[in-house]
Amino acid sequence: MVIILLLLLLSFLDPSLEESLAPRLTRTPRAPCARGQACDPRQRRDAGGRGGVYEHLGGAPRRRKLYCATKYHLQIHPNGKIDGSLEENNPLSILEITAVDVGVVAIKGLFSGRYLAMNEKGRLYASEVFNRECEFLERIHELGYNTYASRHHATTQPPPTGSGIGGSKRRASSKRQWYVSINGKGRPRRGFKTRSTDKASLFLPRVLANKDHEMVRKLRESQRHHTGSHRAPVGRAERRRRRHRGSKGHNRRADI
């Protein structure tokens, strides 16, 4: 009798034990790793930059104004000029900052349509198209400001030589970054003359004010109106051609 009771108890306990142990025993299947690539169990981001460990890449651009510690707003002109402005609501100072790689951003003027760039001589200019000179390393400074250094242009310092046990040992050469900088007169400084600790190289990303958002809204409306005005004549011409074809066909049928 006791044995029968034990068997009945075990039969009642078995389903509950299986249900409690099922989540522990089942494992999430991992995606197969490609040959020659390191296996990463974390989710990878897709082509649009959504999901995964690189979720912050490839998203919508941040609309900001870069306020320099010298009290100037960085602005990008349509003619390719770069300088600073003391005006609070200057449309040329409204920028779009987009991440293009880990810690690398592209800065575009919303109203000028040009990209901030630095050439091999350390001069800032506004490029019509995005190129490698438009890539900047974005770093957060200890004072709360951001610095923006050219990704591809820097000063290569000669490696110092030191005496060792087996003779002289050469150290690896170091590079000094070239930073985006606006001096106290609102003019850009050459990259090789800048330092990360310079006041002119520190920028505070500011969110847009209500007046800035209003200017952006008007810009979008004017762009839509401009696009629609170009499409309208094409539509009217097409309608005229269709009416002309229809009238020709009607006249031919009448002659027959």
Curated annotation (Swiss-Prot):
Signal sequence, start to end: 1-18
Alphabetical list of PROSITE patterns matching this protein: HBGF_FGF
Disordered: annotated segments: 31-54, 151-176, 219-256
SUPFAM superfamilies xref list: Cytokine
GO MF entries: fibroblast growth factor receptor binding; growth factor activity
Lineage: Eukaryota, Metazoa, Chordata, Craniata, Vertebrata
Localization (cell): Secreted
Family: Belongs to the heparin-binding growth factors family.
Domain of life: Eukaryota
TM helices/strands, residue ranges: none
Pfam families for the chain: FGF (PF00167)
Biased composition (Basic residues): 238-256
Biological function: Plays an important role in the regulation of embryonic development, cell proliferation, and cell differentiation.
Cysteines engaged in disulfide bonds, as pairs: none
Protein name, entry field: Fibroblast growth factor 3
BP-aspect Gene Ontology terms: adenohypophysis development; anterior/posterior pattern specification; cartilage development; cell fate specification; cell population proliferation; dorsal/ventral pattern formation; ectodermal placode development; embryonic neurocranium morphogenesis
Gene Ontology cellular component list: cytoplasm; extracellular matrix; extracellular space
Protein's UniProt keywords contain Signal: yes
Keywords: Developmental protein, Differentiation, Growth factor, Mitogen, Secreted, Signal
